[in-house]
């Protein structure tokens, strides 16, 4: 849908949404986002210019339906997919993409690390995707030298970064905030470095005894990004991997650097969001969100979870959705989903579904808590359908209509029960929603309630009704 929009921009030195917004131009993408978010176009333009909102929209991803990530927009959800050397293939990843979009993913990250032709998989995903696609280029940089850190040089990183831009990647996780001076701070951790990209760069610095090349070449990366309107997702290489390590010196030192890099990217009119933890106790989530806003000048915050306990492998879509809802309430702009397979293995299609639904619940709960206009409309509509025993309407309004209908039909599968005024929980005689209090029922109660002895009189009225 965007081919005609971007044609006139091709060849310009800077085609980023931030660049146009700062010139007072409302792009077609901004206008589209304004309609989706029910926001004034002028507000979208101002928020993009300020850096509080991003519209990840590479000019080479022409099939994209533009969306916004930021404090002024609805809380968004990202789904991770990707092939590994030990599991999955290209066809399965495209199927995961389609499933993720079906269940409401606002963006999708291709985290493929090997085992397939990475360029082929990525291109297939971008061509099939109406939502923004993100990547982590250091994975392919390492794969391009067959996993040999000692053979990886600075130009390899930049070559892969530009290749991803050329292919239409909308945002890239760039682990530029991890500095060589941060590495000693990791020693006291329980789980060290848990970011794959961060681990690669830590190994590179330890082997070469040189500063992080993504930091030293950051301005070069900005020059690449602004030619394609690729957005930075500044990676948190030192995110905590357990409750013990949350909010420690290593994490906060990197966060400070991420804030500095945010402002450097903005100086190039390049869009930025900042990634965050991770594993964080409930009582530290508000601090983490507010600290990021302070250090990073309110650039959109994008968190993985966070998980609020470490003892539930197999259920980490739940442990993390609890933290995600709270993070969203406090102002996080996008939540990266976690599946039941987290810490255990590569997720399959059903895991993608489970993780996404858990996170759509968390994001929606955050929007309600933040009193976003219209956020509760669907809840109220479903509640009316529930009160009126309109089963099909309830299924239709559910985040996962198939699952809702499946669970209802396990015990009452016949079509006649779609008109029944009960479910199998209460049965036909005990459902409290069958009690419909009407004006006729209330006749005479007003006067009783006005008297001093109203409570006693009312008890009598109730007894008479019951008899």
From Swiss-Prot:
GO molecular function annotations of the record: 4 iron, 4 sulfur cluster binding; carbon-carbon lyase activity; zinc ion binding
Protein name: Phosphomethylpyrimidine synthase
Family named by the database record: Belongs to the ThiC family.
InterPro entries membership: ThiC, ThiC/Bza_core_dom, ThiC/BzaA/B
Class of enzymatic activity (EC top level): lyase
UniProt remark on cofactor binding: Binds 1 [4Fe-4S] cluster per subunit. The cluster is coordinated with 3 cysteines and an exchangeable S-adenosyl-L-methionine.
Cofactor: [4Fe-4S] cluster
Signal peptide: none
EC number from the UniProt entry: 4.1.99.17
Recorded metabolic or biological pathway in which this protein acts: Cofactor biosynthesis; thiamine diphosphate biosynthesis
Role noted for this protein: Catalyzes the synthesis of the hydroxymethylpyrimidine phosphate (HMP-P) moiety of thiamine from aminoimidazole ribotide (AIR) in a radical S-adenosyl-L-methionine (SAM)-dependent reaction.
Positions annotated to bind substrate: 80, 109, 139, 175, 195-197, 236-239, 275, 302
Binding site for [4Fe-4S] cluster: 423, 426, 431
Organism of origin: Synechococcus sp. (strain WH7803)
Keyword list, A-Z: 4Fe-4S, Iron, Iron-sulfur, Lyase, Metal-binding, S-adenosyl-L-methionine, Thiamine biosynthesis, Zinc
